[in-house]
Amino acid sequence: MSSLKGHPKGLYLIFATSTAERFSYYGMRAIFILFLTQALLFDKEAAASIYGSYTGLVYLTPLIGGYIADKYWGIRRSVFWGAVMMAVGQFLMFMSASSLNNTDLAHWLMYGGLGFMILGNGCFKPTVSSLVGQLYEPGDKRLDAAYTIFYMGVNVGSFAAPLICGFLGDTGNPQDFKWGFLASGIMTLFTVVLFETQKNKYLFSPSGEPIGIVPDARREKKEDKAEHISHPKMDKRTKVRNIIIITALTVALIAFFSYAFSDDWISVGIFTACIVFPVLILLDGSLTKVE
């Protein structure tokens, strides 16, 4: 397998992909609160609520995104579609900042952009780092250094983004925020193009097998089947029972948190999802004891 300075070349593809994605994320965040208060003219309390809800959901959705990648999509598909959704979100933010003369449109574009970025981050964030470990044999002494290199990319993107996007967007003129969002959008688009065009060239296991295509759970079950290890299955009655449990739990939590938080529907959604998502995953009868 091709290598560079003692590491698989796939590591440097993951490094570049993560650097670009973290640039787009932290670049947008660096100017977002200023955009809300100076361009969209939200008061500080409302702006802080939107910003806090966005960042909270960004850290919540990887829970379900990782589950989907592990069970259904596989890592490559999750990374690709996560980056695509984030790119759409960043360009919607650019369009929002370009539509300040139409306040309602600017608000809707902003909320749409946040939604796409939240969903995209949920798919991308928990999966891209897991590719690193699959490039090496278990117990490989280079693995610690590989993760150090990977997180160097994360830190480089996180450090450079506020400087560049802040310089472009925070000029004192509300019309200029769009340039900061555009820079973030371009970097996210670069993430999509880079990963999609290079993944088949560099992402291979030490044995030469492509990594990240088959969902981990499906691959592990095939291996266990070959070794005659059985896994539990859900029958239709169990599936119906689980649907009823999740529905009843969701309705009950929404009612409770609606009473507790009054009209703050974003907090209601976050707190409800924090409980429902783990329960949904735990009710999956196909989970193994290890999972």
Where are these regions (language model features)?
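Central cavity-lining transmembrane alpha-helices of secondary-active solute carriers
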Residues: G52-K71, A87, K125, F159-A161
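Cytosolic juxtamembrane N-terminal segment immediately preceding the first transmembrane helix
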Residues: M1-Y25, N101-W108
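Interfacial helix-cap and linker-helix signal at transmembrane-aqueous boundaries
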Residues: L36-T37, I68-Y72, L100, I164-P174
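C-terminal ends and interior cores of transmembrane alpha-helices
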Residues: W81-L105
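A gly/Pro-rich, aromatic-decorated transmembrane alpha-helix motif that marks the paired
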Residues: R29-A30, L63-I64, V156-T171
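Short amphipathic helix-loop junctions that connect adjacent transmembrane helices
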Residues: A30-I50, D170
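Intracellular loop-helix junctions on the cytosolic face of multi-pass helical membrane proteins
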Residues: M1-K9, P138, G166-E291
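Hydrophobic core of transmembrane alpha-helices in multi-pass small-molecule transporters
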Residues: T19, G89, T103-F124
